[in-house]
A protein has these predicted regions:
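Iron-sulfur (Fe-S) cluster-binding segments and ferredoxin-like electron-carrier domains
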Residues: 259-263, 268, 277-322
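Short, surface-exposed secondary-structure boundary micro-motifs
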Residues: 48, 99-100, 284
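C-terminal accessory/binding modules appended to enzymatic or scaffolding proteins
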Residues: 235-268
Length: 322
């Protein structure tokens, strides 16, 4: 389940796109075409030190000869964004995965409403380019705290479809420049909402949409970062490895991944925050305590899979298909 297809690419260009944000243009080594992708796709990037991180593709999905990603340098980086900014340079060869898409455009739709906060513009920009090429009806709203921190702002304003895009800069008032209530009410049948950005931005958009009675099937979103949630009432529980019968106790301070590693069972991870889905594992028996932002509510309710990087157990034991 966790194995991926990888390929080698060359960093053709690295440039600053905004304050604290750089982009990488990735080309195939042999000059041939790259695996096709659709708007909303992301790739895993293998970084120095054994780190693996996910970055969305921002270029037009009809471009078969390159991938473009943009990376925000996070002040609280666990090594990923710092490695991109400090260690990767034009001319280097790196390993990436083939593209995957958990944030695809819904078709057919009467209209597409695209909302991006900060670095969340990367998959949203690819969507806008795709929709514009198809002459589809869409609006793009791009929110940021300061103009100099908004990647691709100039490119958006210079695009042939710039009339469908609005930039909302918060710096003047200190409050959000976008009136979410006015934008999302009333809900319109056939309109699909796509949102990507920091968790606070995502929560504000989705909470407003749900309060306005947007149907879940018209809401599409992708988180860029989460937090492994530890609660004061977390208790120990057991995890059994189905293939070997090994049992390990997971303490309140540990994640399931960490506990499994202590007995020599390695689960492939990437974000380690319940966002990317890399560590998705089948649950044979027991009831998970889902704390991820990857599975849908319906998938969580089924209790037949979970993300061991962040989720825990409500039952005394989980038996995992490992």
């Amino acid at each position: 389940m966790n194995h991926e297809n990888t390929l080698e690419v060359r960093i053709a260009c690295k440039q600053d796109e905004a304050q604290g944000i750089c982009s990488l243009e990735l080309l195939p080594l042999d000059g041939q075409t790259l695996p096709v992708f659709s708007a909303g796709s992301h790739i895993d990037v293998h970084l120095p030190g054994g780190l693996v991180r996910q970055y969305s593709l921002s270029n037009d999905c009809t471009e078969a000869d390159r991938y473009v990603i943009a990376v925000l340098r996070e002040p609280a980086s666990r090594g990923g964004s710092a490695a991109v900014h400090e260690q990767l340079q034009a001319g280097q060869q790196i390993t990436i995965s083939t593209p995957r898409n958990h944030f695809a455009l819904h078709r057919p739709a009467q209209k597409h409403l695209l909302l991006a906060g900060g670095i969340g513009i990367t998959p949203i920009l690819a969507m806008a380019r795709d929709l514009a090429r198809e002459s589809a009806d869409f609006e793009l709203h791009y929110c940021g705290r300061a103009r100099e921190r908004m990647a691709f702002a100039d490119a958006i304003e210079a695009a042939p479809w710039a009339g469908k895009a609005q930039l909302h800069v918060d710096e003047a008032s200190g409050k959000s420049a976008l009136d979410l209530g006015a934008l999302l009410q009333p809900v319109q049948p056939g309109v699909h909402l796509y949102v990507c950005g920091p968790k606070g931005f995502m929560d504000a958009v989705l909470d407003t949409a749900r309060a306005a009675s947007w149907p879940q099937e018209q809401l599409h979103y992708e988180f860029f970062a989460g937090e492994v949630e530890h609660r004061a009432d977390d208790e120990s529980f057991e995890v059994e490895v189905a293939s070997t019968g090994q049992i390990v106790r997971v303490t309140p301070e540990q994640t399931v991944v960490q506990a499994l590693e202590s007995i020599g069972v390695c689960v492939q991870t990437s974000c380690e925050q319940g966002v990317c889905g890399t560590c998705l594992t089948r649950v044979i028996s027991g009831q998970p305590d889902h704390r991820d932002m990857y599975l849908t509510e319906e998938e969580q309710a089924a209790n037949d899979q979970f993300l061991p990087c962040c989720s825990r157990a409500r039952s005394a034991r989980l038996v995992l298909e490992l």
